[in-house]
Structure formats: structure tokens, C-alpha cells
Amino acid sequence: KRKKIKIQEVESSVFKVIEGEEESYTIKLNSINSSKKKHRKKIFKTPFFGVTFIGVGSGFSVDKQNSSLIVWAEDKGILIDIIADNNLILSSYGINNNAINHVFLTHIHSDHDAGAIENLLEEKKTYLITSRIIYESFLRKAQALTSLSKNNIEKFVKLIEVIPKQKIKIPGFTNTFFEFDYSLHSIPTGRCKITYSKGNTKKIISHSGDTKYDIPKIDTWFDKGSFTQNRKNDLLGFIWDADLIIHDVGGGILHTNYESLLHLDKKTKQKTVLVHQNEKPQTKSQFRYAIDGETISLIK
């Protein structure tokens, strides 16, 4: 036989629960921790030209977000890669996601492209800056994961195609330019230089993408005939003439080791910030290690 339950308010926010003829327990609602906590909304100040690091870890880091960053230019953002939970992370930093519609997709590995799939499922329009071969790989992956047709995907993903060594003005920007090249990785992977130029003001931010920068190994592969002289020169160059250089520093045999960068001159080291971190920063490092959520301004 089921007992009848009676709930009686004995005073404001205090209730007795009575089962049958016996009082079972008392509930004080004002003693229950409220889930409605007051959150002070973060105010994020966007640099006119600079970067914010969304994440700085490798795909195997346990204590860092996967590597992704925003290049800010003309009060708008360009994501370099877009990681899982991107929109949630941006919100936690106080960043308005509506100010960021462009994504440079370096390559198709899940620690770099998961957020693009999420945007697609949320029907958020994305301008995808990448090469044709990387874009075609993205389409195949997106179709396999979502069962959407190419036509449906392209309702929300617009390709801005880039070709190695051809500088373009980024659509939607007035004085911001993008230059693409391929890095050295296990699959086709891009790197870039983003330039703001107006009058006498010119600043460049470069990004290595995932890459194996290792001069002795590249020399060996060249000697074996794996590269042309031009390709070798490109692999060892392209990014170093920037005002801010963002470089891969680990996560496997096809990534750059810290020691492979030590030959760089002092001026270049001072301009270089390390991401895709797979290990703890070196003690007394000659380079700056980026931090999740950090912003660097070149033009305020």
C-alpha cells in the first residue's frame, strides 16, 4: 500500500514533507545553493591588428586547448584553424563570435577543423580561406560526418581559394592581405602571411602551420631528390620576414622540435611565439611560448 505524501509550508521557503502520519523531513529552499550565479561579463578589447590565442596545445595536450588563434584586422577577426567548442571558448574570453566569419583552414586534422563542422551543423556562415586541395578534403570529411550533400554544405561554407605565392586582398577587408604557401607535413597543409598595409603603416603576421622545420632533414631529403631547389628554399623561408612569427613546436615526428629553431638570430627569436605545444615550456627558453587567451597587439 502506497503512503500518501503531504507537503506543508511551515514558514517562508521552509516545507515539511509528511508521509502517512509521520513527518519525514524538512526542506529549506533558501539553504539550497542557487545555480544562478552572478557572472561579470568579460569585456574584450579588440586590437586593430594583432592576435588572440584561442588555444596553444597540440592534439595530444592534456592541459591546453588545441592550437587556434584569431588574427584581428580592421576590427574583424580571421580564425587560423577552428577547434571543437570554438564558440563556447570565444564566449568565455568575452569575444563576440559574430565578428569572426573568416577561417583559414590549414589542414584536415580533427584538432584543427572540428569547429568548422560544428559551425556547419549550427548553420553558421563561414568564409573558408584555403587551397582547393585542402577544401576538397574538407568537403569529403564534412559529407561523411554529417551526411549532408555538397550543395547543402556550400550553402553555409564559402570558399576563398588561395594559391601559393599569390597575395590577395581578403574579401570584406579594405587594407588586409593574405599570402598562402604549403608547409611540410603528413598531408597538404598551409601556412600564411597576413599583412595590414595602409600608407606608411605596414605590419605582417606569419603562421607556420603544422610543419617539420628541420634544416638537416630538409637538406637530406633534397639531396635524395625529394624536393626541388625552389621547394627547399620555400620550406626554409617564407615566414621569417614578419613582425610577429607564430610557429609550431611539437606533437610528433612531423612537427618542429624546439632545438631546430635555436640557430635563428636573436632578432628573429624575439619576434617568434611558439604554439602547438606538446611539452612544458623549456626552462630559460630563448622563445616566447603563447598562452591560452593571450592577446598580442601590433597596432592598437
Task: List each model region and its residues.
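Catalytic metal-binding/acid-base residues of hydrolase active sites
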Residues: 109, 134, 184, 212, ...
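Active-site neighborhood of divalent metal-dependent phosphoester bond hydrolases
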Residues: 134-161
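Hydrophobic/aromatic beta-strand patches that form the interior of the parallel beta-sheet core
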Residues: 52, 104, 129, 160, ...
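Core dinuclear metal-dependent hydrolase active-site scaffold
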Residues: 1-95, 161-240, 294-300
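Active-site metal-binding motif and surrounding structural segment of the metallo-beta-lactamase
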Residues: 77, 84-133, 236-246
